[in-house]
């Protein structure tokens, strides 16, 4: 998801270009998660300090359900707005100082703006902490560990056993 922005950096502040987001390559979020983007576009605005990238992307990611621990495909939709600062002055080729904040991404020495890290961070921030495959997911049986979505479980939970909130039950009576 790389875009050559050399020409845009030469244009005046306020100039805009719109690009489709490359959906041919999956985006690796971490060691286990990969996003398959199906559509997206980014608007690149020339600003005084570099380029402001604003865009939207849609796709799918395979997650693990927090109740039944089964993998499922979840749709994702992300909106992002990130600032990119050049590392090389486009007219002279002189190196520029790095951005003063850690939130600004850097355009490489060949004037290539790479959206991958910005997309990765925004997608990860939008994923649920405990994804659920379906609102009706019954989860795993706490006694035998069986998936209650596949077959009903006949196990009887220990009513008097290890219940950390059992003392609160007496307050309800």
Where are the regions a protein language model picked out?
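Structured interface patches
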Residues: 1-173
């Amino acid at each position: 998801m790389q875009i050559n922005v050399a020409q845009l950096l030469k244009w005046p502040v306020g100039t805009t270009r719109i690009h489709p987001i490359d959906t041919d390559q999956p985006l690796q979020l971490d060691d286990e998660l990969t996003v398959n983007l199906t559509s997206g576009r980014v608007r690149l605005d020339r600003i005084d300090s570099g380029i402001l990238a604003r865009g939207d992307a849609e796709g799918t990611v395979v997650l693990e359900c927090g109740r039944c621990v089964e993998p499922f495909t979840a749709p994702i939709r992300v909106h992002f707005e990130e600032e990119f600062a050049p590392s090389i002055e486009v007219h002279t080729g002189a190196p520029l100082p790095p951005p003063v904040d850690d939130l600004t991404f850097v355009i490489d020495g060949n004037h290539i703006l790479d959206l991958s890290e910005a997309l990765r961070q925004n997608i990860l921030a939008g994923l649920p902490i405990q994804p659920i495959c379906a609102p009706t997911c019954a989860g795993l049986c706490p006694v035998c560990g069986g998936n209650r979505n596949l077959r009903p479980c006949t196990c009887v939970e220990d009513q008097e056993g290890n219940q950390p909130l059992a003392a609160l039950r007496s307050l309800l009576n």
